[in-house]
């Protein structure tokens, strides 16, 4: 995070193109185009800049699919961004990224999250400091080992050209980050997660971020295509809503991206589009031993998938 040579317009152009490509692919799969909601913040507001939200609700395949692009700037990094780097507290910042969460209708199709982003911290009289972050992770309700292996293999293939050490490092980081401490379980079967990444310099770091973003459709769409037509009933939908409750708990209690957006005065509708459209909670409920629902617990611990 010390190299101050970077190219924001190139990053912006890539991110906007990535959002469009993913939105087009999801719309084609679902049969329903994603709506476009462009937004802009005024110069007098705490957070300046704008973005574009692509959103689908009530689709054939996706009950909710949201892909957000934002490019915003503020006068002081929020606590969620500077907690691990107290030397950056109070600096101005620019943050640009693409973030998506897809909630399929069929309980046999896993929820997925992907994010790629760049942040720049600025201070008068000092060189700017930039870094990249992002990753993707899969959250099944009724898990399939083939899906987990495929997802992790694509993640590994995206990272291997940049160093064989990156996939195990980012995989472990993902397992540790997407963990519900109060439930003592992972959010799903993991994937990759990285932050504060700029060690190879701007060009190589940017290439790595692009490789992660470009890998998303290959990591996820084959899984949806395999599972979207599987038959399901009320039992499966009920369990899906119950497990979605865990997703809500993580996003509102632990997720740094959600906290960053809310603490910095971000656009609430775009920040909370990651929430599932339907979720429920049951008091002290446990699945029947040996049931398909009970099998999920075997997957909610870190495992080597490739």
From Swiss-Prot:
Gene Ontology molecular function terms on file: coproporphyrinogen oxidase activity; metal ion binding; protein homodimerization activity
GO terms classed as biological process: protoporphyrinogen IX biosynthetic process
Matches recorded under Pfam families: Coprogen_oxidas
Keywords of this entry: Cytoplasm, Heme biosynthesis, Metal-binding, Oxidoreductase, Porphyrin biosynthesis
Highest taxon of the lineage: Bacteria
Residues at which a divalent metal cation binds: 103, 113, 152, 182
Enzyme class: oxidoreductase
PANTHER family recorded: COPROPORPHYRINOGEN III OXIDASE, MITOCHONDRIAL, OXYGEN-DEPENDENT COPROPORPHYRINOGEN-III OXIDASE, MITOCHONDRIAL
Oligomeric form and interacting partners: Homodimer.
The protein, known as: Oxygen-dependent coproporphyrinogen-III oxidase
Gene name linked to the record: hemF
């Amino acid at each position: 995070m010390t190299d101050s040579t970077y190219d924001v317009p190139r990053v912006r152009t890539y991110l906007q193109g990535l959002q469009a490509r993913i939105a087009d692919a999801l719309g084609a799969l679902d049969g329903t185009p994603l709506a476009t909601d462009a937004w802009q913040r005024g110069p007098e507001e705490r957070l300046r800049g704008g973005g574009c939200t692509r959103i689908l609700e009530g689709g054939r395949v996706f009950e909710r699919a949201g892909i957000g692009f934002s490019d915003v700037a503020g006068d002081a990094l929020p606590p969620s961004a500077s907690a691990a780097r107290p030397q950056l507290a109070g600096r101005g910042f620019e943050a640009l990224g693409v973030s998506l969460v897809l909630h399929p209708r069929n309980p046999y199709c896993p929820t997925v999250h992907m994010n790629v982003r760049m942040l720049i911290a600025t201070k008068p009289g000092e060189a700017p400091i930039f870094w990249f972050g992002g990753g993707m992770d899969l959250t099944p309700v009724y898990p399939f080992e083939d899906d987990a292996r495929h997802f992790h293999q694509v993640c590994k293939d995206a990272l291997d050209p940049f160093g064989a050490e990156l996939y195990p490092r980012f995989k472990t980081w993902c397992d540790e980050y997407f963990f519900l401490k109060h439930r003592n379980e992972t959010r799903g079967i993991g994937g990759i997660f990285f932050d504060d990444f700029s060690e190879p310099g701007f060009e190589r770091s940017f290439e790595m971020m692009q490789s992660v973003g470009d890998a998303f459709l290959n990591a996820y769409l084959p899984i949806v295509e395999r599972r979207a037509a599987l038959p399901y009933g009320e039992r499966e939908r009920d369990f899906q809503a119950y497990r979605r409750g865990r997703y809500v708990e993580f996003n509102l209690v632990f997720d740094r991206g959600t906290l960053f957006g809310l603490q910095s005065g971000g656009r609430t509708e775009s920040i909370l589009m990651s929430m599932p459209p339907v979720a429920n909670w049951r008091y002290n409920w446990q699945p029947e031993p040996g049931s398909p629902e009970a099998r999920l617990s075997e997957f909610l611990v870190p495992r080597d998938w490739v």
